């Protein structure tokens, strides 16, 4: 399926996961404007990378394991206004991290990671790989962020609320800390079902976690004003 945003176009036909609200919100919410280098882990169609390119002057490295998704991603990069700032690497993030050098630390890392535990069935194999934590466990993701993130850098993720307890358990044994969370609420009156997270290298003393909420839709089904402000630079409707 193809999606046209204000400044770029996405074809996600060969990608395991289609363009969705989670990635759009993450790409619009992440604090990228000051970053000179950005790493997109599990780039898929390249949506997060393209949003980062639109919102900053950063050079962006996009790592995607699946070959078909990587081809679609490269196509989308080539057809964008920022092709000279976008680099695709068809590799696992684990292999990529083994090759990284000090000079390649990233100011910001963005990732919409797999979120289904082993045993949950997905219809297509690509979709299964994109959605199952088996392809990138939380422990492996946090290790990759620790290796690739610049000393003063941040990493922005989006996770299901039901995965947060497990994520925090693994995070507690890592070299990273959670410095900000924004609870994402699908509609007024509901409980949050997604969490936007900002990670940084651990400091002493620890920084208190900043907490906030974003509600996506009013009871009428229309986007809230907060959501409109977040996505207005991307959606044609606004």
Swiss-Prot record:
It catalyses: adenosine(37) in tRNA1(Val) + S-adenosyl-L-methionine = N(6)-methyladenosine(37) in tRNA1(Val) + S-adenosyl-L-homocysteine + H(+). It is an enzyme of class 2 (transferase). GO terms for molecular function: nucleic acid binding; rRNA (adenine-N6,N6-)-dimethyltransferase activity; tRNA (adenine-N6)-methyltransferase activity. GO terms for biological process: tRNA processing. GO terms for cellular component: cytoplasm. InterPro entries: DNA_methylase_N6_adenine_CS (IPR002052), rRNA_Ade_Mease_Trfase_CS (IPR020596), SAM-dependent_MTases_sf (IPR029063), Small_mtfrase_dom (IPR007848), tRNA_Adenine-N(6)_MTase (IPR050210), tRNA_adenine-N6_MeTrfase (IPR022882). Gene3D superfamilies: Vaccinia Virus protein VP39 (3.40.50.150). Its EC number is 2.1.1.223. The keyword Nucleotide-binding does not apply. PROSITE patterns: N6_MTASE (PS00092). It comes from the Bacteria. It holds the Pfam family MTS. Keywords: Cytoplasm, Methyltransferase, S-adenosyl-L-methionine, Transferase, tRNA processing. It is found in: Cytoplasm. Specifically methylates the adenine in position 37 of tRNA(1)(Val) (anticodon cmo5UAC). Belongs to the methyltransferase superfamily. tRNA (adenine-N(6)-)-methyltransferase family. This is tRNA1(Val) (adenine(37)-N6)-methyltransferase. It comes from Shewanella baltica (strain OS195). The lineage of its organism: Bacteria, Pseudomonadati, Pseudomonadota, Gammaproteobacteria, Alteromonadales.
């Amino acid at each position: 399926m193809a999606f046209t945003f204000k400044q770029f176009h996405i074809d996600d036909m060969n990608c395991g996961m289609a363009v969705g609200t989670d990635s759009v919100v993450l790409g619009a919410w992440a604090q990228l404007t000051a970053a000179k280098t950005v790493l997109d882990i599990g780039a898929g169609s390249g949506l997060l990378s393209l949003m980062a390119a639109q919102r900053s002057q950063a050079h962006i490295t996009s790592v995607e394991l699946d070959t078909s998704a990587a081809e679609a991603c490269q196509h989308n990069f080539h057809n964008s206004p920022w092709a000279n700032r976008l680099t695709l690497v068809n590799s696992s993030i684990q292999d990529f991290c083994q090759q990284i050098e000090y000079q390649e630390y990233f100011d910001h890392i963005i990732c919409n990671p797999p979120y289904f535990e082993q045993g949950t069935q997905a219809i297509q194999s690509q979709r299964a790989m994109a959605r199952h934590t088996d392809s990138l466990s939380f422990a492996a993701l946090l290790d990759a962020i620790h290796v690739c993130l610049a000393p003063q850098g941040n990493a922005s993720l989006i996770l299901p609320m039901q995965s947060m307890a497990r994520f925090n358990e693994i995070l507690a044994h890592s070299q990273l800390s959670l410095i900000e969370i924004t609870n994402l609420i699908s509609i007024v009156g509901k409980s949050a079902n997604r969490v936007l997270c900002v990670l940084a290298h651990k400091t002493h003393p620890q920084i208190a976690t900043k907490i906030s909420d974003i509600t996506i839709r009013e009871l009428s089904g229309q986007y809230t004003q907060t959501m409109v402000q977040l996505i207005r630079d991307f959606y044609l409707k606004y």
